[in-house]
Swiss-Prot record:
It is an enzyme of class 3 (hydrolase). Belongs to the XseA family. It catalyses: Exonucleolytic cleavage in either 5'- to 3'- or 3'- to 5'-direction to yield nucleoside 5'-phosphates. GO terms for molecular function: exodeoxyribonuclease VII activity; nucleic acid binding. NCBIfam families: xseA. It is found in: Cytoplasm. Its EC number is 3.1.11.6. This is Exodeoxyribonuclease 7 large subunit. Disulfide bonds: none annotated. Heterooligomer composed of large and small subunits. The keyword Cytoplasm applies. The keyword Nuclease applies.
Length: 400
C-alpha cells in the first residue's frame, strides 16, 4: 500500500486533530515553574512552564485570566488545568490554561531572596556606600556580551548624545557557566587600568534563569569593592537582580544606562556657561572688595599725610596759644584787681593818711612810736611826724 504524500499543512492539521481528540491531552493537570512571564495589553497572559529537564509554552486568555485571585510572578511554582493545542501554521504546540493554582515559590526565587536578605544584612546595599556618577565622564567602560542588543543600545545612545566620549568594551559572558567570573574579570580590569570614569554592567532581557549570572555573591562583592562607580543595566524595567541592589545606580534598561552616564553636548555647554557666569560674578565681587580695601587704605594714607599732620599740629598750637593768652590775661586782670583791692586797704590803714586829718605821730630816737606820756622823761629827744614833715623836740616839761 502506497502512502499519500502530505503537505506540511496537512501534517500539522493531522497532528492537531489527534491532539485535540485525545481525552488526556484535553484534560491535563501540569505542575512546574513559571518563567518568561508576560502580561499582554489585550489581557492575555503568556509564559513558559518548566521543570528541571523540559519547558512548554503556555497561554491563558483574558476570559480565564480575570478569574485569577492572585498575580503570577516569575519563578512561581504552579499547577495548571489546561488542554494541549497545536498551532498548525508553525507546527508548534502549547498549553491553553483554564485555571492556575499556586504550588509554592520557585527554587531560584527562594535562592534569590535568601541571598538578597543575607547581603542586605551584611550592609553592602546601604545608601551610604552609593557614589554619585561623574557629571562629565571622559571614558565609559561597558561590560557585556560583544554582540547583542544590549551593547548596541548602550553605544548608540552614548554616541547620539555625545560623540566626544570614549567607549571601551570589555567583552564578557553574561549567561551560562563561568559568566559571573567573566564579569568579575572585567570589573578588575577597569579598576586596575584606571582607564574609565564609570562602568556599565549590561545585559538584555530574559527569564530569571538567563539573568541568574547577576545574582552571584562573588560578583556582588566585586561590584561593591569597585573603586569606579558602577551602573547595573540588566534586563528590562520589571527585572531585578542582586547587581541592581549593590551597584551605585540601577538603570531600567541598557539604553537608559547610556542616557545616565553620557551628558549631552548641550548639557556640557550649559554647564560651561553657568561656570562662566559664576566666575564673572566671583571676579566682580573680588574687584569690588579690592576697591573697598584700596579706598580704606587711601583714606588711611590721607589721614597720615605729614603735611596734614603738621597743619593739624599748627592748629592745635595756635589754639593752645590763644587759650594761654586768654588764661594769662585773665590771671593778670585778676591779680591787678586784687592789688587794687589791697592798695585800697593799705591806703585806709596808712597812718600817713591819718596825719592828713590833723593828727601826728611821736617817735623816739629809735623810731619807736610813743603812745603814752609815761614813756617819756625830761630832756628826751623825740621826733614829731606831721602831714607835711617832721620836727625834733626836746622834752622840757611833762604834764601828767
Amino acid at each position: 500500500m502506497k502512502l499519500k504524500t502530505l503537505s506540511v499543512g496537512e501534517v500539522n492539521n493531522y497532528v492537531k486533530k489527534l491532539v485535540e481528540n485525545d481525552f488526556i491531552l484535553k484534560n491535563l493537570n501540569v505542575k512546574g515553574e513559571i518563567s518568561n512571564l508576560k502580561f499582554h495589553s489585550s489581557g492575555h497572559i503568556y509564559f513558559s512552564l518548566k521543570d528541571e529537564n523540559s519547558k512548554v509554552n503556555c497561554i491563558m486568555f483574558k476570559n480565564n485570566a480575570v478569574n485569577l485571585d492572585f498575580r503570577l510572578e516569575e519563578g512561581m511554582k504552579v499547577e495548571i488545568k489546561a488542554r494541549l493545542g497545536v498551532y498548525h501554521k508553525e507546527g508548534t504546540y502549547q498549553l491553553y490554561c483554564e485555571n492556575i493554582k499556586k504550588a509554592g515559590i520557585g527554587e531560584l526565587f527562594e535562592e534569590f531572596h535568601k541571598l538578597k536578605k543575607e547581603l542586605s544584612e551584611e550592609g553592602i546595599f546601604d545608601e551610604k556606600y552609593k557614589r554619585a556618577l561623574p557629571k562629565f565622564p571622559k571614558r565609559i567602560g561597558i561590560i557585556t556580551a560583544r554582540t547583542g542588543a544590549a551593547v548596541r543600545d548602550i553605544i548608540n545612545v552614548i554616541q547620539r548624545r555625545n560623540k566626544s566620549l570614549d567607549i571601551i568594551l570589555y567583552p564578557a559572558k553574561v549567561q551560562g557557566e563561568n559568566a559571573a567570573d567573566s564579569i568579575i574579570e572585567g570589573i578588575r580590569y577597569f579598576n586596575n587600568e584606571k582607564s574609565v570614569d564609570v562602568i556599565i554592567l549590561g545585559r538584555g532581557g530574559g527569564s530569571i534563569e538567563e539573568l541568574w549570572t547577576f545574582n552571584n555573591r562573588d560578583l556582588a562583592y566585586e561590584i561593591f569593592n569597585s573603586r569606579i562607580p558602577t551602573v547595573s543595566a540588566v534586563g528590562h524595567e520589571v527585572d531585578f537582580t542582586i547587581s541592581d541592589f549593590v551597584s551605585d545606580m540601577r538603570a531600567p534598561t541598557p539604553s537608559a544606562a547610556g542616557e545616565l552616564v553620557s551628558p549631552s553636548l548641550q548639557e556640557m555647554i550649559n554647564d560651561l556657561l553657568n561656570k562662566k557666569e559664576f566666575l564673572h560674578r566671583a571676579i566682580d565681587r573680588k574687584f569690588l572688595n579690592a576697591k573697598k580695601d584700596v579706598d580704606l587704605l587711601h583714606k588711611g594714607l590721607k589721614g597720615n599725610n605729614p603735611k596734614h599732620i603738621i597743619e593739624k599740629r599748627i592748629k592745635e598750637v595756635n589754639s593752645l596759644e590763644e587759650k594761654l593768652n586768654f588764661l594769662g590775661k585773665r590771671k593778670i586782670d585778676k591779680a591787678k584787681d586784687e592789688l587794687i583791692a589791697l592798695n585800697s586797704i593799705l591806703q585806709t590803714l596808712n597812718p600817713l593818711n591819718t596825719l592828713g586829718r590833723g593828727y601826728s605821730v611821736i617817735m623816739d630816737k629809735k623810731d619807736k612810736v610813743i603812745n603814752e606820756v609815761s614813756e617819756l622823761k625830761k630832756n628826751d629827744m623825740v621826733k614829731v611826724i606831721m602831714k607835711d614833715g617832721s620836727v625834733n623836740i626836746d622834752i622840757k616839761i611833762i604834764n601828767e
